Amino acid sequence: MSIFDFTREPISITKPIRLIELFAGYGSQAMVLKRMGAKFEHHRVVEFDKYAIASYNAVHGTDFPTMDITKVHAEDLNICDTNAFTYLLTYSFPCTDLSVAGKQAGMSKGSGTRSGLLWEVERILTEIRDSNGELPQILFMENVPQVHSQDNMPDFRKWLDFLESLGYTNYYQDLNAKNYGVAQNRERCFMFSFLGEYNYHFPQPIPLKKKLKDYLEDNVDEKYYINNEKADKLIKQLIDNGTLPQHNLDRQTDRQTDRQTDLR
């Protein structure tokens, strides 16, 4: 317990939720809200990748077009009537340049990295403020823990300072899926920002009652197995030539060129 437990009002949502997802992917954060039983409206979705938005629409029964975050402006989000609605804006930007599995090029403003697309969110929120518009009451971000590593902390601190300048109170913490009832060792940084001075606590750990074997099937259809002949051919080509078959390479290149988000 801290002094803020006494001086700040606990956050509570009493109005209908309008969800705005930037870097939406296939809508995993909307899926979580549904699993929680939350009632909400898919208000706006910003996703550049055509495959991801097709998946989003198929999963959620929506019909959103692709949108480029670099071309989105304040008016495109259509945030209005905040007295009647709670706007929840998610912005889980690409972790590509932060993850230990990537090149760790960082997220500095103007760096041109995919993780640097975070600052497009700054631009949009600044446009809202400067036009005397209505800011979303809740912001949510999920990313790899390296988002606040020693190397990235200066940029992360700039981001926190910017949000505080708009009137947000920020809470962030690294949480691991294995501590919340899921048989997976997956650590991520979660951050909530509330417009105003509100108190918030991240949930307490949940005992793990399932193991990986509980999710596995005893009998699996043959179609889910890799064909040995094709696998051997692929491995041989990789060893001999160091290349993938061209049709697979073209498809992957197309996807990588189109994406602004990673489907975490």
Language-model segments: which ranges?
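Active-site beta-strand/loop signature of hydrolases that rely on acidic residues for catalysis
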Residues: 25, 47, 68, 137-143
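Conserved acidic residues
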Residues: 49, 65-73, 174-178
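N-terminal Rossmann-like NAD(P) cofactor-binding module of classical short-chain dehydrogenase/reductase
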Residues: 88-90
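Conserved SAM-binding loop
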Residues: 56
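S-adenosyl-L-methionine
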Residues: 1-48, 52
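Class I S-adenosyl-L-methionine
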Residues: 75-85, 96-264
